Structure formats: structure tokens, C-alpha cells
Amino acid sequence: MASTPEEQLVKAVEIASNAAAVSDADLVAQALAFLEQLKQVTHESWSVGWTIWTARTEDGSAPKYEHAPRLFGLNLVDEFLDKHIHSVSEAVNALAFLQESALAYLQSEFVHGHGEQGIVFMKNKLAQTLSLLMVQTYSLSSSYSFLSAALSLCTTHPSADTDSGLNVMATDLMMRVLHDLSLSLGSDATLRSVRGKDRLQRDALVRDEIRTHHAASMAELMWRVIQDSLRTLQIPDAGGTTTASSPQQLTAGNAGPLASVAMAVVGDYASWIDISLVVTIDTVQILYNALDAQHMPLRYATADTLCEIVSKGMKPADKLGLIECLRLDTVLTQLELSTRGQGEAQTELREHLARLVNALCTELCKIAEDTTGAQADTRDAAHTKLLVFLQPALSFLADEYDEPAEQVLPCLHLVLSLYKKTKRQNENMGLPSLSAPTLEFVTQLIALALQKLKFDADIDWQDSSLVGGPADADADESEDDDEQLVRFYELRKQLQVILGAIAAIDEPLVSNTIQTLVANTLGSVASPTELPWEQAEVCLYAAFSCGEILSSIRGNKIGLGAHSYVQIPSEPGKAPARNVRQSLSVYQALPPNTLGEILQLLFRSRIGDHAHPVVQLQYFECVVRYASCFVLWSDLLPNALEAFLDQRGLCQPHLGMRRRLNYLFYRFVRDTRTAIPSEIVPRLLESLPLAVNAVLPEVPPEEDVLVKATEKASAFDSQLYLFESCGLLMSQLGHVPETQVMLFKAMTQPLVEQLLQVVQAFGGDPDNLQLVLQVHHLILALSTITKGFPDYDMNRPTEPAWIEELKPITEQILLALTALNRFSIVREAARGAFARIVTSAGPAVLPYIPTLIHALVHQVTEAELVDLLNFFGLITHKYKDNVRSVMDDVFGVLVTRIFSFLNQGIQGTDDMVRRSDTERAYFGLVHALLSAGLDDVLVSEKNQGQLESVLQSHVYYASHGEPVTQRAAISALAWLVQLWARPSEKAIPGFEQFVYDAILPLVFQVPTKPSFDQSDAQAQLVLSELAGLLKSLHTARGDEFLHYLSSIYLPGVQCPPELAVELTKNIQSLDVKPLKRYLDTFIAQSRGGA
């Protein structure tokens, strides 16, 4: 390493920043370690860092070192000033040195020099350091002259002969310093919210000092910079061609950027210095001039600064006076009008102006609803002024670009909330709900909101979510919508919220406006198919949104239904009974309400015939949202079903749309199946595209193609909705069982035959993975049909005839599983298939379960076994005695497999999670058996050989498991005690001794383990289970148990006699909850005694 500290630092930075080019890895490591050490000791290294930053070449014309070491050096100074200066004994001297050296450096570089060559990131870094230095000035010094001295450089020039105008280089730097200083002191609310109490107190003290000593001179300088820059910009030939005799002079070329920076600084300080320094007769005119300047960034900065000014915390009356003083209504109206329709050139300015309008309206809303801090006349004046600014707000909302519109949305939400409160207050006082100007504004807002819902005709809709995704299977399905579309979706969402807020104020106004939009759109052409696609789509979307809007404001608790579309009469003095269900015939006799009229108009038109994909998909979305209206008015059904079944719907060539439509058709059938005539069901089934064709994806050689094919939703997963729809349709034919069975066979037999053929083909070609995927698909397709049927009803007097037809399906699935059980996707499909089939068919297919288990059990992974155990828990709970023989057949096999996993070692976190799942599933199965009254399965001839292992596993996990597992194991043991430990015919030989030898000790061993934390909530739950176990033991064995406990067990573990007597009394007299509390105390006393 080099000799001096400065040279060492420079060399280390050079090595570290070019590590890839250094062949000696040890040297790089030394350099990085050296630099890290410097960062740890900035109370010593700061001076080296500052020296490197200020060092010059021998002739003084340029910095001595490169950017990287200089920036690193300045970082050391920053760290010292920000966190460590107060911990050094010579803090005041260090501060004085840095102040003096900094002023000398600024004089040299920004008055006489080249201002760091104008490099922005170097100036920004320096500004950050100087702002930290200024903050510490107020903490460690009683002299506050440093800031004044630094600001004076803004008018200091290298030659005494130069006029006293601004020094542009120094001024530009000081504006950056002032900006950083304000941010550092908390002008940014986000930064302020994450700071600690001490930092906030320090910042407040520094702000007070600056307000007292420097605010006036700072404000004077900022306004002078802006005013001088504006004058320079107005000089003829101010297009930037004018050259300066020195870089310090103000010219048309640098005036605009300098004024923009200074204006932004005014915005920084507006929130915390006296408003009289920011807003005066002169400064208001400067602001107007800046808003009208030719330099666009200055106009942006001015609008943003005005936002900061009007958002300043003030008393309501003072704030209203400030807004009136600024007289921005006329200015903003003129600027909005002059920039309207100018294309992208003015869009950014309009965005900033819209933000200013939003700030003004927001502040006026706050004043208008402040009933505690504002007088009535102040609130009334705010209401009046608000209406003035709402006109430019509406104009910005109507902008052809979305960016300005987005800026005024927050204030529109607030305004509507204010008007909702105002309406309620006026009605309570017997006054008109809303004034005429307010009502006019709301009416205009509805029209504009509906207008803004419309897509641009040139939007990129292809392969987007507007049409369900990519058009073909080769496209990337995970590709997100482009940013423009995502932003428009968000805008639509906000506009819908606005429409909902207006509906809360005046529901008929919104519904009637939407009705007019739909009627005018459909009536504007001879056929809706002639409409421009974006006009047809917004007509559909407005209708689509209407139901949600009206339901939300009506407090509809039962969702959209027949009641939503008709005029429900109300009893005198009562609101319509919208949340009370009536019979369908009652609603069919009532006239349609506005929403009903909209839907009748829409669905009786031919708008669904429109050729554009976006319109087609929105039509189907609308049909599904209002599916219940097709039940109410069944004459609308044929058109909707026809659209679903032809090229517009399920036969659509566009893959993305077809996937979405499969789901929508399922939703529609599910919600309208009671209205679909049974005679058209066969034709519907015949029209569905149900061909199953498994396609293997292209994958790299190292990937598992079957996993890839099934790891995320595919086209086939979407097609499964059609198979479920088949089940839904056929389930409605229970009144014609012959037809139902015929159709069920017609639907399933081809699939069963194909499954048989594919399995046979696989036998001759066992490496053909496409055949494996085809088997997976066919199993799922067959089982998903049954998912459309209702759950099996145990109380039904006769079994539906179609259930008998499930048996050959089940048998073929088992044959396929047996042949391909080495493939996890086939095992998963078979498990899922049985879960669905058993749910619908009930006991009829339970005899096939042992075959399923034997085909699966030796191949399943631990995760698969957990799913299988959960499945058995469910069917045991549902079918109870009906599964006795099945469980007797499979329990032993399952337990053997469970123990094989539980006895394996654990390698990492994933293994721990899986093991925990296995334990819970195991005990869940045992609980299911016990709750179903199938405890005799555990001791049957087939399973009694494993009984001891099962019992010992419960004892083990009661003592060593996680709290959740412990509770499950203890609970099961308590249950077994109740069942088997009583003196009765059901008593299990040897179990009584097991109770005393193994189960009873758990009550005292578990809570005395070092790992048992009595203060932990989970541990307390375990203690509750132990208390329950004690009660079960006493209930089962009575006095014998109490005698054994007090005379044999407790003395054997050195329990004091008095404690033993107390415990036995409490076991007899207390319920589980108080006994648990006592047990908690007993354990604590026992530990204390030990």
C-alpha cells in the first residue's frame, strides 16, 4: 500500500472499483477490508476524506483525484457529521475547521473555479455534505454565520469589477444545498414518518433557529434568483444562443434551469417558514409569470410549488384567505383552456396543473367539512370557491390523455364524500338535498366518468387480458399487460368508485344516465354490430358496472338476484325489502327497474354478434354477471346460449378467449341451470368441444416434461370447466332418469374407452410420456363430470340410477392407476378423481378404495400421503359406519407407510414442514375414526398387531411433538381412555395397565420438560388437553385412579403429600377449565419444589 493515509485510500478505492481487472484476489480483499475499516472509524477518518475531496493539482486548476476516491472521502465526512460528531471530544473544533475549509473550498471552486465542471452528481453529493454541516452548526455552535456566509457566495464574483448580479455556479449549488437542508429537516412527510423522537426534536429546533435567523434572507435570495432568471429569459434572442463571458454569469441558456431549481426550493420551504415570506403581492406576480414562462420545467416546478403553498398547514380561515389571495381560479382556467388539445407537447404541464387543482380542491374540501375549526361563513365560502375550481378539475378529467385525469381523482373522491355528508345534513334540516350548481357538477361528472371509461381505439388489445391472454399456445402465457393497459384498468377502477359515490348521493341519476348511454349507443346504428368496437365495449362495461355500483350503495347482502332487476313495492313508511328473498314467480310479476330495463335492452339487442374479440368477451362477462336475470326472464336464454356455443364462444379460435369462456360458460350454467329446459340439454352437451388432446410442452433436457405440463393452469385445466358443466346440466334431469343415464353414458363411455386404449398403448410404448399425460387428462375429465352433480345425500330414499354407471369409470381409473402408478401426475389425478367421485356417488364406490390404496401406497411421496390421509379423514367423517370395512382393510397398510416416513431423518426446513404435515394428518385420521365410532378398526383382527405401535406413537408425540401435534396426540389418548379404560365388555386387555404405565405419566412429564414454556399460548393449550386427559382418567377408572395417583404415582415422583391430596380433590371437583388453571399452578409449585 502507498505511504500517506490519502494515498492509501485512493489506491484502495482504485483496486476495489476495478476488482475484476486485478489478478491478486488477496489484494482486492485487503483493499475492501481497509475501506470498510475507514467507514467504521469515521471519527478519525473524516479528515482524510475531506482532504481528498478538497485536494487540488499543483497548479490549482483541477481536483487532484478521480471522482471515485473523492466521493468515498465525502461519504466518510457525511457519516461523521450525521452520526459520530457528537461523540468526539473536539467536536466544536472539528465543526469550525470544516466550516472554514468548506467556505474556502466554495470560494475557490464555485467563485473562482469551474464548479466541479458542472457534473450534477458531484454537486448533489457536495450539497448533501454541506446541508449536514449546516444542521450540525445549530447543534454545536452558538454562531450561525455559516449559512449566511455560504449564501453570500451567490452574489460573489471572481473579479471585483463584475456587477453584483448572481453567480450562477454558486447559486445553483446553494439551491441544491437548501433543498437537501429542507429534506434533512423533515419537509418531506414520508421521511419524517420513519424518524425517531430524538431526531424529530432536533429537526424542530433547527427549523426554529433557521426561521429566526435566516428564513427572510433565504426567501429574499430564492425570489431574487427566480425574478432575475425570468428577466433574463425575456431578453430578445433568449433561445439559448446568448453566450456568457464567464460561467458564473446568468444567461438565457442557464436562467431556466436555475429558476426551476430555485422554484422547487421555494416549495420545499413553503411548508415550514412564515407564509408572508412566500406569498406577497410581488411574489404572486412572480408565480404568475413563471407559470407562463417559455421554459417548461420552470412551469412544472411553479405548479408544484403552488401545490406546496396551498397545502401548508394553516387555520381554515387563514387557508381560505391564502387561496383567495393567490387568485388562481382565473389563471388556471386560462391555462387549462390554452393547453387543451395540444397533444403530448402540453400533457406534462397539464399533469402538473391538474395536480395543483387537486390540491386546491382538497384543501377547500377540508375547510368545508371542518365543523370544529371553521365558522359557518368560512365553510360556506369554501363550498362556493370549491365549485369554481371543480370546473377545471372536470376539464382535466376529460383530457384525452390519462395522466392529467389521474391527478384530479383524489379530490373528486373527497368532493363526493363531502357532498354525501352535505346531502344528509340538508335533509335532516328539511333543506334541498343539493344546490343547483352542485347537482350540475355531479351530472357533468357522471357524463365525463362514463366517457373516460372508453378505450382508445388504437390501444394494443391483442394477446392482452382484454381477450383472455395470448391467442395461441406458443405465446408466453405469463406475459403481463403493457403499462398503458394496466394504468387504464386502474383508471377504470377509480372511475367506477366515483360512479358509486355519486350513486350514494343520487342513485337514479347514475342508473338513468347509464340507461341513456346504453339506449343511445344501441340506437345510434341500425345494428349494434356496426358500432366502433370501443363504443360497443364501453356500453357493455357501463352496464356490467351498474349492478355492482347499485348493489354496493343499497347494502345488498344477498348479491345480485331476481330482486335486483324489478321494482319492489314498499310498505308505507318502510324501505323496499331488497334483502328478503321472495319466490321467483313473485319477481316475475313485477315490472323491471332501471337496471332491469338496461339488461333487457342489452340482451335483446344483437350486440353479442359484434365481430371484435374485446366486445365479444365483455358481452360474455356481462351475461355471466347478470346470469340471474336469465332465470327471471327465461326468454333471454336462447340468445346467450347460442352465443356461447358458436364461433363467438366456446368454438372461438383465440386460445386466450377460449380459456376464459370455458370458465364463464361454467359460471353461466351453474347459475341458470334451473331455467334451462331439459329438452335442450342433449343439444347443449353435443355442442361442447370436449375432445381431450394432451400436448407435451417443449422443455430443456434437464426438466421433467410431465411436471412442466401440469405445474400451472393450462388449456386443459380450463376445458375441465366444460366437463363440470356437463355434470351440472345432467344433474338437472333427475326427473327423467332414463334420459339422465343415457346422456351420462353417452358422455363418459367414449372417454372410458379412450382411457382403456391409451393404457394399452402405453403397455407397448412405456417411454411415451404423451400417453401418460393423456391418461392424466382423461382421469380428470371423467371425474370432473361427477363434480357437477350434487353431493351424495345419505337421507335420500333411493339411489340415483346414474351412480351405477360410475362403477365402470372407477374400475377403469383403477386399472390406469395400477399400470402407471410410478408417475406422480397419474397418482395425483387418481386421488383427486376418487375424492370427487366419492363426494357425488357416496357408498357405491367405497368398496374400490382398498384397491386404490394398494395401487398408491408404495409409490406415494410424503406429501401425497398427507393428501391421502386427509381424504380418508373426510370420507370417514361423512360416511362413518359405511366405511368400516374399507378402513379395516386399509388402516394397517396406511399406518405402515406413515411410520416409514415418520422414522426418516430430517435434513432441512422443507423436511420439517412436511413431517409436521404428516404428523397432523396421521392424528387427524385417528381422530376421524374415533369420532365416527370406528375405534374397533384399531383392534380388529387385521390391525391389532399394530395397536401397540399406534398407542406408543401417541405417547411419543404427546411428549416430543410440536405443540399442535402434542395436543392432537393427547386428545386421542383421552378419547381412547374414555372408550377402552372403563370396566366394560369393550375394555381392551392390557390397556388398563398401559394407562397407568404410559398415559398417566404424560400429565406430569410433558409440562416439566425444560422446553415447556408455561407463558406460551400454545403451551397453555397443551395444558388444557392434559387437564382433559386427567378428567377422562378419573371418569373411566374412578376412585381406583385417584388412589393410584395419590398413593403410588405421585409419591414415586417425590410429590409432597399435601400437594397430592390437593390435586386429587381438584380432579374430582373441578371442570376442565379451572382444573387446567390449577394444573398450571401445581406444575409451577412442583418445579419450585424441585
Swiss-Prot record:
One example of the protein's molecular function in GO is:
tRNA binding
GO CC entries: cytoplasm; nuclear matrix; nuclear pore
Its chief place of residence is nucleus
Q: Which Pfam families has this protein been placed in?
A: Exportin-T, Xpo1
Q: What keywords sit in the KW lines?
A: Cytoplasm, Nucleus, RNA-binding, Transport, tRNA processing, tRNA-binding
InterPro entries hit by this protein: ARM-like, ARM-type_fold, Exportin-1/Importin-b-like, Exportin-T_C, XPOT
Might you name a Gene Ontology BP term for this protein? tRNA re-export from nucleus
* Localization terms from the record: Nucleus; Cytoplasm
Instruction: Tell me the function of this protein.
Output: tRNA nucleus export receptor which facilitates tRNA translocation across the nuclear pore complex. Involved in pre-tRNA splicing, probably by affecting the interaction of pre-tRNA with splicing endonuclease.
Family of this protein: Belongs to the exportin family.
Q: What is this protein called?
A: Exportin-T
Tell me the gene name. LOS1
